Each structure stands twice: as C-alpha cells, then as structure tokens.
Amino acid sequence: MAVHQYTVALFLAVALVAGPAASYAADLGYGPATPAAPAAGYTPATPAAPAEAAPAGKATTEEQKLIEKINAGFKAALAAAAGVQPADKYRTFVATFGAASNKAFAEGLSGEPKGAAESSSKAALTSKLDAAYKLAYKTAEGATPEAKYDAYVATLSEALRIIAGTLEVHAVKPAAEEVKVIPAGELQVIEKVDAAFKVAATAANAAPANDKFTVFEAAFNDAIKASTGGAYESYKFIPALEAAVKQAYAATVATAPEVKYTVFETALKKAITAMSEAQKAAKPAAAATATATAAVGAATGAATAATGGYKV
C-alpha cells in the first residue's frame, strides 16, 4: 500500500529524536481522540500523559538535519489528523506525512554517501525499522475506521520507543567511537563472531516471526562455539556483546517475540560493527600476517579467563 512508501521516513524521524523512555506520541501531546459517535464495540484508549518534548535544534550531522525535517512533517501530520473526523484520521495522516517526508528525503539525500560504514549502518537500521513498521501496521488491520488510527499510532509509538532505546538520542557517532575499550582477545576473534552472526541471521530469516529470537540466539551461539573450537560457549562469554544486549534491554521490556528479536539482533550488530572498526584501527600493519595465530591463542586465553561465566 501507499503507506509503505513512507516507512523509512517515519521511523528515522522518531528513532533518533524521541528519548528512549518516552512515547513519541506523548512527546507531541497526542492522545487517541474520542469519536463523536463511537462505533459499536469501540472504546478509545486512555490518552497518554504528555511527556516533556525532546530538545529541538541539536542536529550536528547531515543525517540529523534530515531527521529534524522529517520530525516536523510527522508533527504536521498528527496536527492535520487531529482536525478531521475519526474515520478520516488515518488517511489524512498518511497523505500529510507522505508529502512532507518525501520532500525531506529529496532534499536531504541528494548528496553523495559519506562512506561505506555509514551506508551499511543506514541499511541495517532501515531493515529493523521496516520490521517494526510491519508489526504496527498489522495491529491496525481489521480495525473499525474510528479505531484504526488510534491502534496504528499507539503501536507505532511503542515500537519507536523500543528502537530509540538502542540508539543514542541526539548524536550519531561512527560505531568505533561508541566503544571505549575492547580487550585484545575480543578484537582478534571478531571476524569469527561476525561470520557467526551472518549464519544466525540467515537461519532466523527463514523462521516464523514467533521463533526468530530463539532460532537466532541458538544458531549464533552454536556458530561461535564451532568457529572458535569451543573456546567460547556463547556470545555471553564476550563481554562487549553481552553488554550491548543488556544495554538494549535496559531501555524497554521487549515482550513480543518479533520485538525482542529486533532489539536483540540490532544490539549485537551494532556491537560487532563497533568491534570490527576498532580492530581495523588498532591492528598494526606489521602484525597482519600473525593475525590467525594470535586469534587462536587469544581465544584460548579468553576462554580460560571466562571461567565463572554462564552458559545459555
């Protein structure tokens, strides 16, 4: 449908602007409207208490400048929807936001890409946001005209809040800058971890939505153990990866299997990318030929140091 054309714009707008612990719809003062003549069986949701709006005008990168424009379009769409009859809110929102977001993207994405790392990061984020959008859109399917808009915005707002929890709100930094210190042992096995991640992602993509999380986690751990000769039992023995997952979960309570998988995979991908970038910057050119031997030794030593950790 036409709504799908604006998926990326909508999610990018909120994921980098809204705070991790606040509903975006609440930030805008949005509360589901009460229809003048409610349809049979329809009970509007209780309006959320408006939260303090996120500070504006803090864009420091081209990406954030684009976000501010899209964010303004999103607010305009909510305002437009608030002025029409309940049955017309959903259609009005889509039309208004679609025009604004298309204009913002035309202006903001006209320049050349800044680099492969940024392009890869945007592609990964787009994929996760698209999955969350589908979850929100599915929730609104089959609803009465009066309820569809409320269901769509409420579910979308919660999905965006979860995604925002995995991102840094007012700064878009290169992945390597987000990693403070990574032990040498972890850096030297990152290529194996990256390969294991790809194996797990492939397995999860073929699984039903409700099974993606368990399939991914099991496949990821098995691949890590196999590729390191048993030195690492699971991702939980690699502190940087475990910390990334814990940080993602700390921002929200991911109960739906689809959402849990999205949060989990996004956190791991972000950590692996950061570790990979740090490895490239830290590895001396003269030591390149010794990487394979060093990786085996580091993996064995790290496994010994990990005694007392826990297995899945």
Swiss-Prot record:
Q: What main location does UniProt list?
A: secreted
Cystine residue pairs: none
The record's subcellular location field reads: Secreted
Any Pfam family hit? Pollen_allerg_2
Annotated signal sequence is: 1-25
Q: Which InterPro entries match?
A: Poa_pIX/Phl_pVI (IPR002914), Pollen_allergen/Os (IPR035506)
Tell me the domain of life. Answer: Eukaryota
Key words, A-Z: Allergen, Secreted, Signal
SUPFAM superfamilies for this protein:
Group V grass pollen allergen
Listed under GO cellular component are: extracellular region
Q: Give the family, as the similarity comment puts it.
A: Belongs to the Poa p IX/Phl p VI allergen family.
Identify this protein by name: Pollen allergen Phl p 5.0101
Organism (species): Phleum pratense
